[in-house]
């Protein structure tokens, strides 16, 4: 063959070889491409999750007035009218679950009342006053089992008292996601009998303790025995609270005084019909 023809054939072979190499990716190239796709998918999922966490209320809808039954419990045990036995508490939590109620966190309740927005029609806020030990040993397992959430109104000066929750208990329960904590003052005194300065100390100190130890912004104060006066409301605001819980009966609404929210007391021996009435009626 002529030298020019040989050079042409060789050149054509090299070109075809290079073209084949470009079209058939090596295993390493395929693996890198696969890893890149997975990373991209993870990035999209992570971004969507972050956006959801950054905007937790994006799917809530606006209403003219929020009607929020706030259930009031204390000890989950037997003994007196402030104690609801665990068996009855479980029946009531099961009722909420089977009837499609959404139990709000304290932050969600504050948001709902302040912005008049709700996630669904059937909502309820469960509160347990006085931070009794049985809130952890009796109520908490039931709440987890029925997938409900509750707020414990915590007496910050009682952490070393018998039959009350410790800080370690509170941290453990908070981490579960079923429980949050709001303030019930430091010493559980009748606020309306105290001077303004002592009231302010009780309110401010308990909020600072909860904020620091539980790494949160405590927005709600629950009045001990429901007792408060106009000076208390002034102290609430100065201490940095957004809402306050009383013991006056009734379903809370977004048009109520935010520093005097009504609650529905759950008592032992209550029938499910009576319990249902607490969720739907002010009577």
What kind of feature is each model-predicted range?
Residues 1-31, 35-36, 40:
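Sec-dependent N-terminal signal peptides of Gram-positive bacterial secreted proteins and lipoproteins
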Residues 15, 146-148, 177-179, 237-243:
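Glycine-enriched alpha-helix->loop->beta-strand junction motifs that scaffold or abut catalytic
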Residues 24-68:
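N-terminal, intrinsically disordered, polar/charged segments of Gram-positive cell-envelope systems
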Residues 63-104:
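N-terminal structural segment of carbohydrate-active enzymes
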Residues 66, 71-79, 122-124, 132-136, ...:
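Metal-dependent polysaccharide deacetylase catalytic core of the NodB/CE4 family, i.e.
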Residues 87-116, 211, 237-256, 263-269:
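C-terminal domain-boundary segment and adjacent tail
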Residues 112-127:
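Charged, often glycine-rich, active-site loop that binds/positions anionic groups
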Residues 267-283:
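Low-complexity, Gly/Ser/Thr/Pro-rich intrinsically disordered linker/tail segments
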